[in-house]
A protein has these predicted regions:
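A short, polar/charged loop-to-alpha-helix boundary motif
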Residues: 1-14, 135-153
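CN hydrolase (nitrilase-like) catalytic-core segments centered on the catalytic cysteine
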Residues: 38-138
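Generic alpha-helical secondary structure signal
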Residues: 77, 81, 145-148, 163
Length: 174
């Protein structure tokens, strides 16, 4: 849970304690990872290993309006790149729904401009649909069978070195 200027969520929310369990729905098994979870490849991987057919990231992410344009671009590009990486590494489509618009700061600061750019990615990280910075309804078709094909040509889940990952359970490696 973030603790950044404008995102003081650590003071209001507690991390979940139910693990990473996909939700069975009429459209498939959804691995729902909310906001801050999207930055962690381990969360996406655990959802994929638990059988998620789609990763869904509902989020509200933006930038300080006073940031220079290069910094804004870096932040947005890193956000999209992380999603594309999760799609590729796990061989599943990724759906990211982000807020748009401006929220003023109650403290008198510049507030937050939410950058939108919601998107749907295929299992190879390719864009299937993408919104801009205005409120948008994205409608597209996703071929869930394609993930199986992608996982056969890129067997990243199969070829993991689980024997070598014990240190991932440590905060730091001594």
């Amino acid at each position: 849970i973030p603790d950044d200027p404008g995102f003081y969520e650590k003071f209001y929310f507690t991390p979940g304690d139910l693990g990473f369990t996909p939700i069975d729905t009429s459209v498939g098994r959804l691995g729902v990872l909310v906001c801050w979870d999207q930055w962690y490849p381990e969360a996406a991987r655990l959802m994929a290993l638990a059988g998620a057919e789609l990763l869904l990231y509902p989020t509200a992410i933006g930038w300080d309006p006073d940031d220079v344009q290069d910094e804004k671009n870096r932040q947005r590009d890193a956000w999209v790149l992380s999603h594309r990486g999760h799609a590729v590494a796990n061989g599943v489509p990724v759906l990211s729904c982000n807020r748009v618009g401006h929220e003023a700061s109650p403290l008198g600061a510049s507030g937050i401009n939410f950058w939108g750019n919601s998107h749907v990615l295929g299992p190879q990280g390719e864009f299937i649909a993408e919104a801009g910075t205005d409120p948008t309804l994205l409608v597209c078709e996703i071929d869930l069978q394609r993930s199986e094909h992608v996982r056969r040509i890129w067997p990243f889940l199969r070829d993991r070195r689980i024997d070598a990952y014990g240190d991932l359970l440590k905060r730091y490696i001594d």
